[in-house]
């Protein structure tokens, strides 16, 4: 959901064009593209080539997604690292140094950032939030299994008490 949210903000608030979203789950990818005017591919797609993008958001944070971000960012480009799934792994310092790639880690936000985000969501500046699915807390285990197994199409699930 963080990747979709980043894409929606870039598209609808920042008026960015040529957005590409990468998602391994075909169902989630198809569902996300209903809400975002973007190209969508699986991570192993031949459409994702090296040195292709000026800015890359890694919203997952696995070693494999970090490596893909480094491979596909253009020389002089920027990688914004948000995801925290895996704490460590291999890192191509040579490419990032020789090609002067900027890496920005982001985790926390200011109260002003939080207020702005709530305003964007409340005023539907990024469209309806129909991509969010709500389930009871007792369905949490099955929701995680569906996400893991690739059978869940919802980009975001919120568990309700």
Tell me what each language-model feature is.
Residues 14, 61, 74-75, 152:
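Short conserved AdoMet
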Residues 38-45, 134-139:
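Short acidic-hydrophobic, aromatic-tinged amphipathic segments that line or gate anion-handling sites
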Residues 47-56:
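A short acidic, Gly/Pro-enriched loop at the edge of an enzyme's catalytic core
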């Amino acid at each position: 959901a963080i990747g979709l949210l980043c894409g929606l903000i870039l598209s609808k608030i920042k008026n960015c064009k040529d957005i590409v979203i990468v998602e391994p789950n075909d169902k989630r990818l198809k569902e996300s593209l209903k809400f975002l005017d973007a190209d969508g591919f699986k991570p192993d797609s031949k459409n994702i080539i090296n040195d292709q993008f000026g800015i890359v958001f890694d919203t997952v944070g696995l070693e494999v997604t970090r490596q893909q971000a480094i491979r596909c960012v253009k020389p002089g480009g920027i990688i914004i690292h948000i995801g925290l799934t895996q704490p460590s792994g291999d890192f191509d310092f040579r490419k990032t140094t020789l090609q002067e790639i900027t890496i920005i880690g982001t985790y926390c936000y200011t109260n002003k950032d939080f207020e702005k985000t709530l305003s964007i969501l409340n005023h539907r500046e990024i469209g309806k939030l129909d991509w969010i699915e709500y389930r009871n807390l007792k369905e949490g285990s099955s929701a995680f299994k569906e996400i893991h197994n690739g059978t869940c199409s919802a980009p975001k699930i919120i568990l309700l008490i």
